[in-house]
């Protein structure tokens, strides 16, 4: 596994502790792999999909990921409502997919809040 910015190489033996772990994304700090998750007022974790990850809170996915990837879902939804020149209020901003696709659809400003 390479870190493109610094060219760090991860020895494959470092992956042994996470071998077989499914539905989690890990962060590598240069020495160890740690699940990207939070355990405060609930359980939050990033879950991999075929493309962009989805956020899961207490077992509930925050993005559609069955038969569509979260990015394509956000693109399709924003294409229905955002027009060039729009100012968009994105509530429940989450991972920012809707905000990104609102800009790509021509929004001149996106105000995003969680």
Regions found by a protein language model. Give the residues of each.
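Conserved SAM-binding loop of SAM-dependent methyltransferases across substrates and taxa
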Residues: 95-107
């Amino acid at each position: 596994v390479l870190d493109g910015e610094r060219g760090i190489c991860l020895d494959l033996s470092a992956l042994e502790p996470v071998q077989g772990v499914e539905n989690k994304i890990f962060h590598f700090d240069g020495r160890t792999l740690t699940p990207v998750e939070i355990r405060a007022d609930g359980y939050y974790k990033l879950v991999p999909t075929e493309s962009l990850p989805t956020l899961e809170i207490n077992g509930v996915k925050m993005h559609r990921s069955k038969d569509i990837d979260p990015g394509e879902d956000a693109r399709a939804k924003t294409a229905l409502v955002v027009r060039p020149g729009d100012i968009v209020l994105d509530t429940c901003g989450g991972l920012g997919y809707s905000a990104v696709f609102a800009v790509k659809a021509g929004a001149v400003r996106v105000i995003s809040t969680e």
